[in-house]
């Protein structure tokens, strides 16, 4: 078997594993600590910067498959393997980045700036999910949630320490709170918090 076919086979196995994880409604099998930053530019809301820190067991399994040269580090090519294995299967779930705008969720247009590293035995990934909502003269309100509704991956998102990056031309206010009363989030665990944002032109 050629090395390219071997790599393709390993990637396919990873994709199948992650696809099953997304579709399964079960007790959590993977654990990840999440931090987020809401991003704005002069045009308005532009996306969510994500940092996911996985548990040691999942990290070891992913590294065993993705670390092709077995040096315990993640090269650019190996990061590409991880990006495909982790994010491709959850594309239809909006990469677990749910942003309520009115009565709908915003759709992620693309993923950018993906990075991966191993830190103290844990796989850490960083990426930006691009979503857009233009600024207006009056307040625009959003609710940001990063979570797996199936709870196969238990994502603990620290919304109390979430951050916002915005230009001086915008006025942005935000706070963390529960999701009670928000019908779009009925399928989510009751303890999950959202980042409530409102913004307008100064």
State where each predicted segment sits.
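Early extracytoplasmic/domain-onset interaction patches
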Residues: 28-54
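Mature, soluble, non-transmembrane domains
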Residues: 100-202
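Bacterial N-terminal signal peptides that target proteins for export
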Residues: 2-13
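Short, hydrophobic/aromatic beta-strand segments
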Residues: 47, 60-64, 137-143
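Structured domain cores in non-transmembrane regions
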Residues: 57-132
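N-terminal signal peptide c-region/cleavage motif recognized by signal peptidases
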Residues: 19-23
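Short solvent-exposed loop/turn micro-motifs enriched in small/polar/acidic residues
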Residues: 29-31, 91-92, 109, 190
């Amino acid at each position: 078997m050629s090395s390219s076919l071997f790599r393709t086979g390993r990637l396919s196995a990873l994709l199948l594993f992650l696809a099953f994880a997304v579709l399964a409604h079960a007790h959590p099998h993977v654990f990840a600590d999440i931090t987020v930053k809401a991003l704005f530019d002069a045009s308005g809301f532009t996306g969510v910067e994500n940092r996911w820190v996985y548990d040691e067991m999942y990290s070891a399994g992913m590294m065993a498959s993705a670390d092709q040269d077995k040096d315990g580090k993640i090269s650019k090519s190996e990061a590409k393997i991880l990006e495909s294995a982790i994010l491709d299967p959850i594309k239809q779930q909006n990469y677990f980045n749910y942003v309520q705008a009115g009565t709908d969720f915003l759709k992620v247009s693309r993923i950018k700036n993906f990075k991966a590293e191993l830190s103290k035995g844990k796989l850490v990934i960083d990426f930006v999910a691009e979503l857009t909502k233009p600024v207006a003269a009056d307040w625009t309100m959003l609710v940001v949630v990063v979570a797996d509704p199936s709870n196969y991956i238990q994502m603990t998102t620290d919304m109390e320490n979430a951050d916002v990056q915005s230009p001086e031309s915008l006025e942005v206010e935000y706070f963390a709170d529960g999701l009670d009363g928000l019908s779009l989030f009925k399928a989510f665990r009751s303890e999950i918090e959202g980042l409530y944002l409102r913004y307008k032109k100064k």
